Amino acid sequence: MYQARPRRRVQAPLILLPVLLLAAACGMPNRVRSMFGGQLPIQVTISPDANENSPLAVELIVVYEDKIVDKLLEKKAREWFSGREQFLRDYADDVDSWKWEWIPGQEIQPLELSYGMGAKRVVLFADYVTPGEHRAAIDPQKPFRLVLGQSEIALEEVR
């Protein structure tokens, strides 16, 4: 004799999936986005007198391991740029990296970078000719404006 079995177990995930997708799309806490990866919107402003009126290399690194975040936050920009190739080879599976070179006063269209699941931190380095750390860090879930001033780098959260 055949007995119908309740389908609650199948229905619950099917009902839950659209709810989770809707919640993620509507701005569920930013940490959820980090768990699954996402898009990182970035605005860039470059001062007309940035870097003593010389082109400025900038690198953005999305980091997926806390120990690597700590290593990067110990580095000054000059150290980063001189050893970046080896660092990226050593930690190829634990970071994503984007590099640009901009000129003072250049207008940059808004950027949107894709990052993977489990991103811990975004670290940026700017290769100014003047001495200094020239490093900044922010959560990957927070849209931001990168401000490249005359002799320093700054990040501003964008709401």
Cite the ranges covered by each PLM segment:
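Helix-rich interaction surfaces within compact, conserved domain-sized segments
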Residues: I108-V129, H134
